[in-house]
Curated annotation (Swiss-Prot):
Enzyme Commission number, as recorded: 2.7.7.60, 4.6.1.12
Function: Bifunctional enzyme that catalyzes the formation of 4-diphosphocytidyl-2-C-methyl-D-erythritol from CTP and 2-C-methyl-D-erythritol 4-phosphate (MEP) (IspD), and catalyzes the conversion of 4-diphosphocytidyl-2-C-methyl-D-erythritol 2-phosphate (CDP-ME2P) to 2-C-methyl-D-erythritol 2,4-cyclodiphosphate (ME-CPP) with a corresponding release of cytidine 5-monophosphate (CMP) (IspF).
Gene designation: ispDF
Protein name from the UniProt record: Bifunctional enzyme IspD/IspF
Residues reported in the UniProt entry to bind a divalent metal cation: 228, 230, 262
Amino acid sequence: MTTAAIIVAAGRGTRAGGGVPKQWRPLAGRRVADWTLDRFALRQITHVVLVLHPEDHDAWDEFATTPLILAPGGSDRAGSVRNGLAALDGLGITKVLIHDVARPCVSAATIGAVLDALDAHPGAAPGLAVTDALWTGAEGLVTGTRERDGLFAAQTPQGFRYDAIVAAHAAHPGGAADDVEVARAAELTVAIVPGDPDNLKITRAEDFARAERILRQDMDVRLGNGYDVHRFGPGDHVILCGIKVPHDRGLQGHSDADVGMHAVTDALYGALVEGDIGRHFPPSDPQWKGAASEIFLRHAVDLVRARGFAVSNIDCTLVCEYPKIGPHALEMQAEMARIMGLEASRVSVKATTSERLGFTGRSEGIAALATACLVKP
């Protein structure tokens, strides 16, 4: 079976305050949307659709370089979901999860329970049994009570067999509160799986503090360091952090000798306790002769994600007298961010000298140091 997830991120989120839609606000060092997307970086999920508001131009540009499938938001939530479903047409999807971007604390256990329930039912969703007394009210006064037995607070992801929910949305007149209501209108059976009190939906400003507490209590943070050095040799340019920089000499190495990218790659491997580039790409193997270092970095990033981690930020320092790094630093930052699928503000590239001491001070080569921070929610 082929499973997809649709992350609905086209809302404006005005009740949460902050001046920007809540999915783009910071939360525990990252954006809400970043946390939510990472929750669905699971082996069982082969495709992820991110539904974006048409006016979120920066987000469209940022995610266009990632493996995500992008879809435009509709005039309401149902329209956004339909656009997300349409983006999966022809991909052979059998199961689909539909999730609100404003639920960044959803657990892998909840996602797995929904997927498992779809083996026996055309629909499944997490729900929390209502335990509080329920009132009705008007003008600040209690006007009555309601029986709470059999009542559940709905959560996401709400999962469905793909063809069934596509047909249900096509037939629905609109105005549904969620996708379970759409499914029920089409007479689909929807199983209730246990919800999670921590799977809150960020709606109001105070919800950010609670979500941050939840994320930080289980967060696994790893740090890795990388160091590399290459000597100068004949040439007319060097490649640093993926950017070709004119110089009167080149750097010598088995691959393209990108000392900065090598240090960052080793920092990622180090955080995972996976050795260094040489373990994964032995210099004794001729197939890596002259290879682009992007290959190594992508491998490290893929390994990070396969282990359930996300790259929080990267810091790389280049040590050399020449060439001058400053004029190229922003371009290097953007290129590294592109390769790793990060926003540029999470990648730092800077330079220093050794005050003319040592081999870098004698302009015999370039050294690079890097630190990588990984997080697992």
